[in-house]
UniProtKB/Swiss-Prot annotation:
It comes from the Bacteria. GO terms for cellular component: cytosolic large ribosomal subunit. This protein is located at the 30S-50S ribosomal subunit interface and may play a role in the structure and function of the aminoacyl-tRNA binding site. This is Large ribosomal subunit protein bL19. One of its GO terms (molecular function) is structural constituent of ribosome. PANTHER family: LARGE RIBOSOMAL SUBUNIT PROTEIN BL19M (PTHR15680:SF9), RIBOSOMAL PROTEIN L19 (PTHR15680). It comes from Histophilus somni (strain 2336). GO terms for biological process: translation.
Length: 116
């Protein structure tokens, strides 16, 4: 029984997901349905958390929009995600960057990771 579930989940995994880590800045293009129209909407932010659970993997992006912090959780293998682009690689030493919620301005900056 579990082999059937694993096989079905394996078929639904996306193959074109780039590798990224917490601290990286991503641009995620998402399909949005408004009435009868479908359009792409971009969300660019810093990865503050990643949840590795196979087909149920997710990541959280945070950005500041008009002075207000906005966080959005994306399911990594969701069909509404059109593309994920890594814009900038950040150098951090923690897996969860929840401390960025309390910071603003220059203290919320993340150094750029050079090299790999």
């Amino acid at each position: 029984m579990s082999n059937i579930i694993k096989q079905i989940e394996q078929e639904q995994l996306k193959q074109n997901v780039p590798s990224f880590r917490p601290g990286d800045t991503l641009e995620v293009k998402v399909w949005v349905v408004e009435g009868s129209k479908r359009r792409l909407q971009a969300f660019e932010g810093v990865v503050i958390a990643i949840r590795h659970r196979g087909l149920h993997s997710a990541f959280t992006l945070r950005k500041i929009s008009n002075g207000v912090g906005v966080e959005r959780v994306f399911q990594t293998h969701s069909p509404i995600i059109d593309s994920i682009t890594v814009k900038r690689k950040g150098a951090v030493r923690k897996a969860k960057l929840y401390y960025l919620r309390e910071r603003s301005g220059k203290s919320a900056r993340i150094k750029e990771r050079l090299g790999n």
